[in-house]
Amino acid sequence: MAMTEESMDQVEVNCLCAQHAQTCTRPRCFAKEGLCANWFYNPALAFEGFDIPDSYQEGHGVDIEVKCSHHSSKLCHNGHDMICSYSRLGSHINIRCICNKPRPHMSLIEAACSMYNLN
């Protein structure tokens, strides 16, 4: 597979995100805001006689990188002109599923959106 080609699983994640964006009713939605959910799959490792790093976590899921952002807008409240602004630090959302079907599924996307709304 060429480096520029997306895996079939990533294509499926992209389709699930597009479906989610059409039906999501949350105040904020990573899919509607154009953030990309990146697919990963870490199979179970069974190496006899070898140590498996503690940092390795088997499962499948999506990663979303949330960049830093700043927003400001002008608001008139009770006859007073105000400039309101907020800054959001960057973050990383990781949703890892350990079910026995390592394929993209809508539960991953829904969980990612729930976490995005906690951010």
Swiss-Prot record:
This is Early E3 13.3 kDa protein. The lineage of its organism: Viruses, Varidnaviria, Bamfordvirae, Preplasmiviricota, Tectiliviricetes.
